[in-house]
Amino acid sequence: MSAGAGTGARRLFAGGYTDGSGRDGISTIAFDVGRGAARVVRTDGCAPNPTYLARRGSFLYAAHELDECGRMASYAIAADGSLACRGACTAPFDAGTCFVLPDPNGRSLYGANYLSGSVGCCALLEDGRLVAGLPSRRHEGRGLRDDRQEAPHVHSLSFVPGTRLLAAVDLGIDALVIYQVDASGAIAPDPVETVQVPAGSGPRMVAYHPRLPIAALVNELACDVLVFRIGEGGLQWRIVEQLALPQTPGGDALAAHVAFAPDGRQLYASVRGSDRLVVFHVDERGSVGGRCDVPSGGKGPRHFSLSPDGRFLAVANLASDDVCLFARDAADGAVRAVAHVRVPQVACVVWDA
């Protein structure tokens, strides 16, 4: 079973909060495409609160969101979808790991530490084991809002395509901080560029167009998306568009996630509060517009992911404890809900392929 199967069964992994419940937090989901049905077939995990997952090859990596330390773990994926923990990397001076990113070269694993406002790093061995020792990078400063931006809060990480530049999105200081990473995986002490966004925006996640030098940054607090054109070598980011997202009557909606379709023809974003999945159209030059939106299939769409072939989209609705699966029209990017599955306190969902 895999996410690449045509009309048969596909597999997904969902992670979330366990909050001292004692249960494992990573669920394996079987999605029957033909019947339009999904079910949880097992749960695994070796630490609480695996709130973000990333897959690379035959391994699944998890950010375990803990108040007392930073923690990332590695799991080997078996043929039946079961997970075997290969080890974990704990950083006592970091806290609140909410995002994990494997290096494309397979040698390092990076974590965004929300509570400590830092970027963590550990070495990654071929068998999936993690080795601590690479230094983390800690941000300084604060933002406009006392309730959410009293300190740095690194929320996500990404490699700028075609480079060894690591981009850290910091909600607390309204910035995207870009570091050079060497061949060993070590992060340079000082950033090579800091991209500031409007005060109070609260940036959360960034996505890259699959072909064009375009990036989309979703701002949680401003509830909008900023589209950037990236200069040569992955630097000199320049805002070219600002896209509004659906608000609530009280104006308290929080944007959550953003991703381009695999073919680059659509840009998707999710919004909590209004509980919408938003679709923008992207032209051949990278201009974004033509917004439409649909219900997320639940409440609190914290995260979503598109299947590698672009045929399906899965949404993790944290506030309603479910994953909603959508079929996607390849022609216009429109999505249609086809299945639901209950996953308690789900925060992230990824496809197994």
Each model region followed by its residue ranges:
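Beta-rich, blade/repeat-based domains predominating
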Residues: S2-G4, A47-G57, P92-P104, E140-T163, ...
